[in-house]
């Protein structure tokens, strides 16, 4: 594609050093640049892509997209925001692939990963070839790849959508993070259904205030329904029990489907009960009601199921199809995942890393425990420090014993993070133990547990690494827990 043909899709730019070269690839990593590439200079938190423009040209870049003039001998496309320009141009370069997919986007603080997984599994049960983009992995049909971010950069995202289209995928569920929405990574994505799970405190290190965080999430609904196509009606699926839904309701032009358990909603759950294999309840919808059995547990998972069911109903699936598929839905790795080595107590690994998600997990654990509840919990470094005392307060309030430890401290001092946590529970000093080393903390909890107890290891879930300083070391809560049980005998 000629450079100027590609740029015709982009508003507001100026080209320094004229020319109209052929563009055969788009790249944002200078190490991947080859002859004929269009290289995007992106500003990161620690690295500025503008510093790698000369390297990109030396590797064969035919043109550069940048936010400031550069001394290179190829056309430089000057824009106000390289990330947003990349999203627009990637969508155009790859042929607007989302226009050929049924695309469901899920946003919210908690529940995105499980909700998208349920949606994808329901669609797959109907015989559709599906795709999934999220925190744990990216799936294209039956193949999966590790995910670097909850929502990839737009270039990777559109490249993945193009791959999905080429391989016959027709239905995609994806997580949409507030960072991705704020940075314009999903600009150009043509969503058919947008789903809101909930909004609680998280990512204030990035957004600054809850209002800004709320507004960023709302961008998904603001762009929904902007392109009318009677053959592809669009829907917003909102959690009626979360008051933020009232705000999002006024941000979208699309029809709204509500779900909930407390407020009267379009999609609801009634007669919820725990079973030996999970949960059972009555799924009530405008299309009638159906009995549902699921391997998932916890009220938070009822919400995830309701969100997924509402999205699938809006996508045209029948109630009977959805109810039947829910019986076979498998839990997501690291989301309330049980570690079973034959011990006479329960070990659960969960990704809960916000005060709200930790509270929900501990409330569910309390229902399962015959005796004491232990929780191993830490807080991530270089992230919102204001939630650290809140996490600690939740831990000591709902567990019999809380063990404070490291999560991913990143560039911060792990001991300072723990001091921030301890500051929230000074009046309840007897209910917690601080063990900075995460492996030791897990071993301590498992060593203390007796028959009928539950040990909840929270915060990292599916992650198989720990970030300490600039080092990424191999670490898996589940593997550590298994080893601790075996050593205990």
UniProtKB/Swiss-Prot annotation:
Motif Meso-diaminopimelate recognition motif positions after renumbering to this chain: 407-410
EC number(s) recorded for this UniProt protein: 6.3.2.13
Top-level EC class as recorded in UniProt: ligase
Modified residues (N6-carboxylysine): 217
Cofactor(s) needed: Mg(2+)
Positions annotated to bind ATP: 108-114
UniProt GO MF annotations: ATP binding; magnesium ion binding; UDP-N-acetylmuramoylalanyl-D-glutamate-2,6-diaminopimelate ligase activity
Entry binding sites for meso-2,6-diaminopimelate: 383, 407-410, 459, 463
Pfam families in UniProt: Mur_ligase (PF01225), Mur_ligase_C (PF02875), Mur_ligase_M (PF08245)
Pathway as given in its UniProt record: Cell wall biogenesis; peptidoglycan biosynthesis
Keyword tags: ATP-binding, Cell cycle, Cell division, Cell shape, Cell wall biogenesis/degradation, Cytoplasm, Ligase, Magnesium, Nucleotide-binding, Peptidoglycan synthesis
GO cellular component: cytoplasm
Domain of life of the organism encoding this protein: Bacteria
Compartment(s): Cytoplasm
Binding site for UDP-N-acetyl-alpha-D-muramoyl-L-alanyl-D-glutamate: 30, 149-151, 177, 183, 185
PTM field: Carboxylation is probably crucial for Mg(2+) binding and, consequently, for the gamma-phosphate positioning of ATP.
GO BP: cell division; cell wall organization; peptidoglycan biosynthetic process; regulation of cell shape
PANTHER family registered for this protein in UniProt: MUR LIGASE FAMILY MEMBER, UDP-N-ACETYLMURAMOYL-L-ALANYL-D-GLUTAMATE--2,6-DIAMINOPIMELATE LIGASE MURE HOMOLOG, CHLOROPLASTIC
Function (record text): Catalyzes the addition of meso-diaminopimelic acid to the nucleotide precursor UDP-N-acetylmuramoyl-L-alanyl-D-glutamate (UMAG) in the biosynthesis of bacterial cell-wall peptidoglycan.
Record NCBIfam families: murE, PRK00139.1-2, PRK00139.1-4
Family: Belongs to the MurCDEF family. MurE subfamily.
Name of the protein described by the UniProt record: UDP-N-acetylmuramoyl-L-alanyl-D-glutamate--2,6-diaminopimelate ligase
Annotated organism of origin: Geobacillus kaustophilus (strain HTA426)
Gene: murE
